[in-house]
């Protein structure tokens, strides 16, 4: 679960960076 959460956070961060 921890690894899954970390991956999810990284994906969200990457998406946010792409938007900006």
Swiss-Prot record:
Similarity section: Belongs to the PsaG/PsaK family.
Localization per Swiss-Prot or TrEMBL: Plastid, Chloroplast thylakoid membrane
Its membrane topology: Multi-pass membrane protein
Organism of this sequence: Pisum sativum
Gene Ontology terms describing biological process: photosynthesis
Keywords associated with the record: Chloroplast, Membrane, Photosynthesis, Photosystem I, Plastid, Thylakoid, Transmembrane, Transmembrane helix
Keyword RNA-binding applies: no
Residues passing through the membrane, by range: 2-20
GO CC entries: chloroplast thylakoid membrane; photosystem I
Protein name: Photosystem I reaction center subunit psaK, chloroplastic
